């Protein structure tokens, strides 16, 4: 019930928003957010690939570090890899730890070298992920040149925990092989025999060495012989690796190696790219066969090919990042598919709206077309007599007439009939003409 003097105010009309306008405004915002997410994901992937490339570089390169007397020598490898000592030197060099070189001590620098350096570094740092070694003359045995400044120089590699190991007995042949586009990289090699190790080369009870007799120079021999090749063969004997043990001790060669992709090994050592392909060599080794003629498979080195072991180690070290990359790639694929479907549906709906608008502009077009079709069907002749055929012939010869032309034609026909009728009357004939004759004239 309304009170007198108070009138209800009409509701304020709300602006009507066209549904197509909202559909046109929303997609740019969604595409902007999608582009932003794509940039973030790509930056994460690039960062992950950079870290992975750095990881492989640390595994393949030779690392060299030094420390002077009184300092600590720090050796460290990335996760899922251990230290493999290649060489060690402890001696006198004034260029490394001192700016002056007294003339009286120039000759002593050649003889001031500790012979137990390599073995000591092996005992402290071999197969360790990190190693901190105090550089002091008492650590490496008797001081051969007291009072002089000395330093420790170590060269090492970081070998993955999961590598290929091969042991070959003395007087047997060592064969190393990698698949296409991958080449050998030797991490460690020892030739000899350990004291407490059982004999893996013979079932007979043989003489055991009283001490570990190992030759670490086997690493240099195998590196010169097999590094950067796909196949390598060598006879394990004292001629190639020397004789570190006493006579009668059965020795064996233990090798740790990996097959590294060509592009990664070339990035570390460009000299690998200059190697020329060769056939079988005289001593039984196999050269690198970059383009075998018998192979019909198209070979293509990927831009980002990695060692399967290193990739597995990287995924284990970064599970969250690997999961993020996988989920992000799936999301990007779904988002692109959704965008394609949305664009397709939007375009189809806009096309239908446009077609409907055209039909509304010409509402009677369909009806006019139907009427014209009915008229054409009615105009077909139903009889086969001569007047019907003649009239049909006339219609086909004059398909379309305007109203003015039709009036002129009717007037001409009427005049012609009058003239013909006058001629018949003047000639004294019957004035009645056949109907079909008048139509003929």
From Swiss-Prot:
Its main location: membrane. Residues 49-322 are extracellular. Glycans are attached at residues 62, 165. It is a single-pass type I membrane protein. The chain crosses the membrane at residues 323-343. Ubiquitous. InterPro entries: EVA1_dom, Lectin_gal-bd_dom, Lectin_gal-bd_sf. Pfam families: FAM176, SUEL_Lectin. It is found in: Membrane. Residues 1-23, 362-390 are annotated as: Disordered. One of its GO terms (molecular function) is carbohydrate binding. Belongs to the EVA1 family. Binds heparin. This is Protein eva-1 homolog C. The gene is EVA1C.
């Amino acid at each position: 019930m309304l009170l007198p003097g108070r009138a209800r105010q009409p509701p304020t009309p709300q602006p009507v928003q066209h549904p197509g306008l909202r559909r046109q405004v929303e997609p740019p915002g969604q595409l902007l957010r999608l582009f932003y997410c794509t940039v973030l994901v790509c930056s994460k992937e690039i960062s992950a690939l950079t870290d992975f490339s750095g990881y492989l570089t640390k595994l393949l390169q030779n690392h060299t570090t030094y420390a002077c007397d009184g300092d600590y020598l720090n050796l460290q490898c990335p996760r899922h890899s251990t230290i493999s000592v290649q060489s060690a030197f402890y001696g006198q060099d004034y260029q490394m730890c001192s700016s002056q070189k007294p003339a009286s001590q120039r000759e002593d620098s050649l003889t001031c070298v500790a012979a137990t350096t390599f073995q000591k570094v092996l005992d402290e740092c071999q197969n360790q992920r990190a190693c901190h070694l105090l550089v002091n003359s008492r650590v490496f045995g008797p001081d051969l040149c007291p009072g002089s400044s000395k330093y420790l120089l170590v060269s090492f590699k970081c070998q993955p925990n999961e590598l290929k190991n091969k042991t070959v007995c003395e007087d047997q042949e060592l064969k190393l092989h990698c698949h296409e586009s991958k080449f050998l990289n030797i991490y460690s090699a020892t030739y000899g025999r350990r004291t407490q190790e059982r004999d893996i080369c013979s079932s007979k009870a043989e003489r055991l060495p009283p001490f570990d007799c190992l030759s670490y120079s086997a690493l240099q021999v195998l590196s010169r012989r097999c590094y950067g090749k796909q196949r390598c063969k060598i006879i394990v004997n004292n001629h190639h690796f020397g004789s570190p043990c006493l006579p009668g001790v059965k020795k064996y060669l233990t090798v740790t190696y990996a097959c590294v992709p060509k592009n990664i090994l070339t990035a570390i050592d460009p000299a690998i790219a200059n190697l020329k392909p060769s056939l079988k060599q005289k001593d039984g080794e196999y050269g690198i066969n970059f383009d075998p003629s018998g192979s019909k498979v198209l070979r293509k080195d990927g831009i980002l090919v990695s060692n399967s072991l290193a990739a597995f180690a990287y995924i284990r070290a970064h599970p969250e990042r690997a999961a993020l990359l996988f989920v992000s790639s799936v999301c990007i694929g779904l988002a692109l598919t959704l965008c394609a479907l949305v664009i397709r549906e939007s375009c189809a709906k806009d096309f239908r709206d446009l077609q409907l608008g055209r039909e509304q502009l010409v509402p009677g077009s369909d009806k006019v077309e139907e009427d014209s079709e009915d008229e054409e069907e009615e105009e077909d002749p139903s009889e086969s007599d001569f007047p019907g055929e003649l009239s049909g012939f006339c219609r086909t010869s004059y398909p379309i007439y305007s109203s003015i032309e039709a009036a002129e034609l009717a007037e001409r026909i009427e005049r012609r009939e009058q003239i013909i009728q006058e001629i018949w009357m003047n000639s004294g004939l019957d004035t009645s003409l056949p109907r079909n004759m008048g139509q003929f004239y």
